[in-house]
Amino acid sequence: AGASVKIIAPISGQINSAKGDAIKIDHSFPTVSSVMFDSVYIPGGTDSIKVLSTNSFAILFINETYKHGKPIAASDEGLLLLAKAARAGGAINDTYSEIGVAIAENNEVNDDFAQDFIDLIGMHRFNERPDLDAIAA
């Protein structure tokens, strides 16, 4: 068993990191569907989250991932995007259920957080989320 990591962004081609490093984009949100993936991790980054928070394709991607019961992990400013997607999707109390969602406590992306996400991926789906019918996706 193994995992394959893909970078998805609002545009195709490449983007630059905060340090100026080029990052190859594997897919763009307008041309890819969440059904192609088993899980999603939303990392932080103030500038990237500002851009993604105003991108309807990114919001839809997260909501579809959640609605399909797939694992989601978020850290740092990625928590803001996760919350915005939940509100936009019509989640109960404007927040997703914690079932199948890994959150980096105190923004600590450490081995425990990584293992929690790996364990969630191993469980595959979380169809027992109480709010799946409420999510617009």
PLM region descriptions:
Residues 1-137:
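Active-site-adjacent pocket-lining segments in enzyme domains
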